[in-house]
Curated annotation (Swiss-Prot):
GO molecular function: transferase activity, transferring alkyl or aryl (other than methyl) groups
The enzyme's E.C. designation: 2.5.1.-
InterPro entries referenced in this protein's UniProt entry, alphabetically: CmoB, Mo5U34_MeTrfas-like, SAM-dependent_MTases_sf
Gene3D superfamilies documented for this protein: Vaccinia Virus protein VP39
Encoding gene per record: cmoB
Entry protein name: tRNA U34 carboxymethyltransferase
SUPFAM superfamilies per record: S-adenosyl-L-methionine-dependent methyltransferases
Record-level GO BP terms: tRNA wobble uridine modification
Native organism: Trichodesmium erythraeum (strain IMS101)
HAMAP family per the UniProt record, alphabetical: tRNA_carboxymethyltr_CmoB (MF_01590)
Catalysed reaction equations from the record: carboxy-S-adenosyl-L-methionine + 5-hydroxyuridine(34) in tRNA = 5-carboxymethoxyuridine(34) in tRNA + S-adenosyl-L-homocysteine + H(+)
Function: Catalyzes carboxymethyl transfer from carboxy-S-adenosyl-L-methionine (Cx-SAM) to 5-hydroxyuridine (ho5U) to form 5-carboxymethoxyuridine (cmo5U) at position 34 in tRNAs.
Superkingdom of source: Bacteria
Residues the entry annotates as binding carboxy-S-adenosyl-L-methionine: K95, W109, K114, G134, V184, E185, Y204, R319
Taxonomic placement: Bacteria, Bacillati, Cyanobacteriota, Cyanophyceae, Oscillatoriophycideae
Amino acid sequence: MLNKNIGYISPDYLYKYNSPINTEAILKIRQERQAKLFKFSHEKYYKAVQTIADIQSNFFDCSSAVIKVGHPEEISPGQKQRLYHCLQTFCPWKKGPFELFGVNIDAEWRSDWKWDRILPHISSIKNRKVADIGCHNGYFMFRMVDQQPELVIGFEPYSKHFWNFQLIQNIVKQKMLAFELLGVEHIHYYPQFFDTIFCLGILYHHTDPIGLLRKMRQALGPKGEVIIDCQGIPGDLPVALTPQKRYAQARGIWFLPTQSCLENWIGRAGFSDINCFFAAPLSVEEQRRTIWANIDSLPEFLDPHNPSLTVEGYPAPWRYYAIARK
């Protein structure tokens, strides 16, 4: 359905399912946060999306690395100029790649690499209810469409990311995709609702990773599956690094676990059948500066004389991917 201020919004799932979702709490937060979408500080984002409201296409391909929307010949030179300016408004693009009407967006992160690593290890999400926690601009949500889920709810509290998702959703109009301005701390409002939960790149940004994992477990139905991607450090001991202030120039990094530490977190949250299926140093090919993300990135975050260390002298980041069941 169309919302005159936002654009295309999928049918509200809250009224579809006979489940113990805390609808009252979700509606309250939704109302509060949707009002903030139009704050002066976010004006450039929603106005940018409005400038391309007339650009539409029936072509949407999410089956490969680059999410493709529209063909170049479907839009006029004037429309292409407006589209380009709209897309530039959302720089730096952190997740991708995308191609919109022939405009190639090479994002800072090769998110397709992550998806290609994960997909062979998960149970089918066909006809399943899925949560994507920290969905950002929706890259993984759009990739999931190809797997034919029943419903995908993206959890993302930041308004910029909402509008970034919306500029694409307004064109592709995928009914199974819902974007909520919620954080991982709200996942327990969906008790036993989801079949699969993706939590990619989130845990190390929070002060209570085990508590959040427990909330995710509450939100999973019987035999539900959680997929975790967590930044961490190398080592055999089940320990986590807590940086004094910054890690790889980033604030808001609280706990960086070793593989065994992450597995222990997941186990102590009550999950079983834990399988860490990927463990490797983060590479400067996977996270780097691009034209669409002209910002300092991993190459600048590492010690130029010793890339096994960050600029602060901590162990350089690893990525751990794990899957577990309720």
